[in-house]
Regions:
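Glycine-biased, small-residue-rich flexible motifs in mid-sequence functional cores and linkers
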Residues: 1-137
Length: 137
């Protein structure tokens, strides 16, 4: 799947990429109050029709993703995992995918074996890609 200058392996609802997007990236420097406000704003953005896009790496980003999915809104998740043609997400992400609420994207040029822990550099790169796709560079 080609999105702008980026090429991805994709699993899930590919139509989500054509929706208005909102990147989610909870910064470490946020105070607890800033973090709470930012997370609330992300959920409100989803309620207003924007599809959240992020690697959803931090526990706070995962909380935002989980709330949005529980409310029935879609998300696009970037991952460093290799998405083969037989890949399927597990748990709640499997359910979200089966309901058309999820699109998983993996940059084709950087698949990482499942047993490899994601690095800070990879996290930063995935966040930058999410922000670029959402037009929030």
């Amino acid at each position: 799947m080609q999105v702008g200058e980026y090429r991805f392996a994709a699993v899930g609802n590919m139509a989500l990429i054509d929706s208005p997007l909102h990147a989610v990236h909870v910064r470490r420097r946020f105070t607890p109050e800033e973090r709470r406000r930012y997370m609330n704003n992300c959920v409100v953005a989803a309620r207003r029709g924007r599809v959240l896009i992020s690697p959803f790496i931090s526990e706070y980003e995962k909380q935002v993703r989980d709330v949005v999915l529980q409310e029935g809104f879609p998300v696009i998740q970037l991952t460093n995992e290799c998405l083969s043609q037989f890949y399927k997400p597990s748990g709640e992400l499997f359910h979200a995918c089966s309901q058309g609420q999820l699109l998983l994207l993996s940059p084709n040029d950087s698949p990482v074996p499942f047993s490899t822990r994601i690095t800070r550099e990879q996290c930063n790169q995935l966040n930058m890609i999410a922000e670029a796709i959402a037009g929030e560079e």
